[in-house]
Amino acid sequence: MIIKNASHEITAVKPIQYPVTGFPEIAFVGRSNVGKSSIINTLVNRKSLARVGSTPGKTRQINFFDVNGEFYLVDLPGYGFANVSKEMKASWQNLIETYLYSRKENFLKMVVMLVDIRHSPSKDDIIMYQWLKGFGLDTLIIANKVDKISRGQIHVRINDIRKVLQLDDAEKVIPFSAENRFGLEKVLAEFDNVLSIPGEEQKD
């Protein structure tokens, strides 16, 4: 996949505001400090398409980004942010749940769940992953911040993530770095696989 252009399409807080173009969608979820916005910017080769907040937990809406005029990357609110009220957490959960329910049948092709490769998945990560699988959604795990560990530790950390999340052999975990683009081509290849956009040829 070659990403030629990307732009912010719309910010939504309820289904009536979602895009109506019919484009397929790939959604991103992750803890509020995992670098979700930075990963999206790296994938589309833009420095500030998705806004990187100075305070974790900044994303409180759903942001749709048009990629190549063919599909959307969807930035969902971060979870696991401690310094917010229970009411706010419930509001964000409802925002995510409403999106998943309304888009999973016709638009949502994959959910990308982001974790920090340096640490074992948290209780919130485990709950989120089980929740996504309960929806029957195709889920890809991206283990970000691989630039913060040695090459020799990558395999060890990936195995730990697989064990904690109880992944089967068919479920993929891709080590990634938003800083140096490590793993970029593998992630884009996964996007090719699920999108099957006419005229696109999968590249190694």
Swiss-Prot record:
The source's superkingdom equals Bacteria
Task: Report the Pfam families cross-referenced here.
Answer: MMR_HSR1
Alphabetical keyword list: Cell cycle, Cell division, GTP-binding, Magnesium, Metal-binding, Nucleotide-binding, Septation
BP GO terms, sorted: division septum assembly
Which residues does the record give as GTP binding sites?
30-37, 57-61, 75-78, 144-147, 176-178
Q: Identify one Gene Ontology CC term for this UniProt entry.
A: cytosol
What would you give as a GO molecular function for this chain, any one? GTP binding
Question: What parts of the sequence cross the membrane?
Answer: none
Q: Which cofactor does it need?
A: Mg(2+)
Question: Which residues bind Mg(2+) per the record?
Answer: 37, 59
PROSITE patterns, alphabetized: G_ENGB
Q: Which residues form the EngB-type G domain?
A: 22-197
- Listed CDD domains: YihA_EngB
Q: Give the NCBIfam families listed for this entry.
A: GTPase_YsxC (TIGR03598)
The entry's function note states: Necessary for normal cell division and for the maintenance of normal septation.
**Family according to the record:** Belongs to the TRAFAC class TrmE-Era-EngA-EngB-Septin-like GTPase superfamily. EngB GTPase family.
Protein name as it appears in the record: Probable GTP-binding protein EngB
Taxonomic source organism: Ruminiclostridium cellulolyticum (strain ATCC 35319 / DSM 5812 / JCM 6584 / H10) (Clostridium cellulolyticum)
User: What's the name of its gene?
Assistant: engB
